[in-house]
């Protein structure tokens, strides 16, 4: 590290001189980062030797011991600088914290300085600071900062590359081959460090020739390389982290025995690449399973090519893939269960089992309810009010006489419907509510009967109520009638009186309809009897006794007997 600092100082020496900066000081950040300490300096008085070539001047003590030179004002300035500067406050601490160059123009200096205006520049570098000072006003020049940062980054780049190259050689070659290679690389390092320095180049030539040629792209590139190498310093072998060398992207690659400096290495640890790729694909590794899925690995062609190399990595990949598959299925199961108590695996499985049991119980209850409803419907659909005659249920016409009877066959269906209506007959419901002094709300629910709505309208009119709104709805054999009525001015009608009247009318309507049906059935039977008797007399009068006529007579008598039975049943 000391040699690197000295080399950096020699690279920065062209900046100082009689027509340039008075001195350049290199400050190094201490390990505890509480202060910066003196590492070295370049004095502008050394330029007098190169210009005069004689030793006429008296030599005095100067902190720049690289070259003996006459004592000048620059030496006086350097002698007043401390060996270390605390970083509690001040421009040094601010420069390191902000990592920004400080270009300061000062007007007050110590009494030993005659000039009243001076310029001080603090440039942050990895691990320290570079300070430039001049006893005159110097305009801010970015080229000076780029010049310092460029040499610092190149020096750090060379140092990191050499150290990593030596570490690779130590790890990859036998012990007997190390001595010659280390000597060869040491000589190359010495050649790089002993490059001819531009001591005889003046600062003006540097400003005019070299500095303007540095483009912004090169400056940014150097800064990026410096930051990257500065981060990689923690993984160098000198810090004891040899295992991390495989992850360092700036390992050197040798081609035909010639090391290539500063190029990223492609020879990284294959196992590390496999592990990193698997971690990126799976996201996380869940523990809790003890078997592996070998069938998936055998089907994967990617693993067949590596069958001779990474058996351990192959088993690890298979185990992780199997766990990922289980986790995906577990997540899918968790999304289907509505109630999850906890997010661990055992709780998810337990909640899923309980949910399945609840669904099974619910399905069983619905099945039982469906069976009960079907049994109830079967019982209600059986014929009611029938009569047994010689073991045969008689509910209408005899089946054997339907082809010979003059009565339509639809009569049997009407009788069945009438019998069902009788079995489901209900008590009428009447609700009457008085909205205000004259308006009433009337609701009548009863069985549907032909002419029932007309009779309700007539009843309301007879009570002195005028219907302003009416609504009727029928469902199966029931009908709901809703009326909004208004009484006349000269009528004194109460809600209870209206309800009782309508309830009596609906009951009488139901009974009257049944009586009408019975009377109609009786009249039809008498008419059929007269027709059959007239047909029989006509046959005897003509003297025809055809076998078919005899069968017709028997059927007519049988049907006449059946009609009497049916009439008896209706009564």
Curated annotation (Swiss-Prot):
It comes from the Eukaryota. Coiled coil: none annotated. One of its GO terms (cellular component) is nucleus. GO terms for molecular function: chromatin binding; DNA-binding transcription factor activity; protein dimerization activity; RNA polymerase II cis-regulatory region sequence-specific DNA binding. Residues 310-359 form the bHLH domain. Residues 381-390 have a biased composition (Polar residues). Residues 275-321, 365-390, 536-571 are annotated as: Disordered. Residues 368-378 have a biased composition (Acidic residues). It is found in: Nucleus. Keywords: Developmental protein, DNA-binding, Nucleus, Transcription, Transcription regulation. Residues 275-284 have a biased composition (Basic and acidic residues). Disulfide bonds: none annotated. GO terms for biological process: anther wall tapetum development; pollen development; regulation of DNA-templated transcription. Homodimer. Interacts with ASHR3. Transcription factor. Plays a crucial role in tapetum development. Required for male fertility and pollen differentiation, especially during the post-meiotic transcriptional regulation of microspore development within the developing anther. Binds E-box regions in the AHL16/TEK promoter. This is Transcription factor ABORTED MICROSPORES. The gene is AMS.
């Amino acid at each position: 590290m000391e040699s690197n600092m000295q080399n950096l100082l020699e690279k920065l020496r062209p900046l100082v001189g009689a027509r340039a900066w008075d001195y350049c000081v290199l400050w190094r950040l201490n390990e505890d980062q509480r202060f910066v300490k003196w590492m070295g300096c370049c004095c502008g008085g050394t330029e007098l030797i190169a210009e005069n070539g004689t030793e006429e001047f008296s030599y005095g003590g100067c902190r720049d011991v690289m070259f003996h030179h006459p004592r000048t004002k620059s030496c006086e300035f350097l002698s007043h600088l401390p060996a270390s500067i605390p970083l509690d406050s001040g421009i040094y601490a601010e420069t390191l914290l902000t990592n920004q160059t400080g270009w300061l123009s000062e007007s007050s200096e110590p009494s030993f300085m005659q000039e009243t205006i001076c310029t001080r520049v603090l440039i942050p570098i990895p691990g320290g600071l570079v300070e430039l000072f001049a006893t005159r006003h110097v305009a801010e020049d970015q080229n000076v900062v780029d010049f310092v940062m460029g040499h610092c980054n190149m020096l750090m780049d060379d140092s990191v590359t050499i150290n990593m190259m030596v570490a690779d050689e130590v790890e990859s070659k036998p012990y007997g081959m190390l001595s010659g290679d280390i000597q060869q690389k040491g000589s190359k390092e010495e050649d790089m460090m002993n490059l001819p320095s531009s001591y005889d180049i003046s600062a003006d030539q540097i400003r005019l020739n070299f500095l303007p040629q540095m483009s912004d792209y090169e400056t940014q590139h150097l800064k990026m390389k410096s930051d990257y190498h500065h981060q990689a310093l923690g993984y160098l072998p000198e810090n004891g982290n040899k295992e991390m060398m495989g992850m360092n992207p700036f390992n050197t690659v040798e081609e035909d025995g010639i090391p290539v400096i500063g190029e990223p290495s492609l020879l990284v640890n294959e196992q590390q690449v496999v592990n990193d790729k698997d971690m990126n694909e799976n996201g996380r590794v869940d523990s809790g399973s003890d078997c592996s899925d070998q069938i998936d690995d055998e089907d994967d062609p990617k693993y067949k090519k590596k069958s001779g190399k990474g058996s351990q990595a192959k088993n690890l990949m298979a185990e992780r893939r199997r766990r990922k598959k289980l986790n995906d299925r577990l997540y899918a199961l968790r999304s289907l269960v509505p109630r999850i108590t906890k997010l661990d695996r055992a709780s998810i499985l337990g909640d899923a089992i309980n949910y399945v049991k609840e669904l099974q119980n619910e399905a069983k209850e619905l099945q039982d309810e469906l069976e009960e409803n079907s049994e109830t419907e079967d019982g209600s659909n059986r014929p009611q009010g029938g009569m047994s005659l010689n073991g045969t249920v008689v509910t209408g016409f005899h089946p054997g006489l339907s082809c010979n009877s003059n009565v339509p066959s639809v009569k049997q269906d009407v009788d069945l419907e009438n019998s069902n209506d009788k079995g489901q007959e209900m008590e009428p419901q009447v609700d009457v509510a008085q909205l205000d002094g004259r308006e009433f709300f009337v609701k009548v629910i009863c069985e549907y009967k032909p002419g029932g709505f007309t009779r309700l309208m007539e009843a309301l009119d007879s009570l002195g109520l005028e219907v302003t709104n009416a609504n009727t709805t029928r469902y199966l054999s029931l009908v709901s009638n809703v009326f909004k009525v208004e009484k006349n001015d000269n009528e004194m009608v109460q809600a209870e009186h209206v309800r009782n009247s309508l309830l009596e009318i609906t009951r009488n309507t139901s009974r009257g309809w049944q009586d009408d049906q019975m009377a109609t059935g009786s009249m039809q039977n008498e008419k059929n009897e007269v027709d059959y008797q007239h047909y029989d007399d006509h046959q005897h009068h003509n003297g025809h006794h055809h076998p078919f006529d005899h069968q017709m007579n028997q059927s007519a008598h049988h049907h006449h007997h059946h009609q009497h039975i049916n009439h008896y049943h209706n009564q």
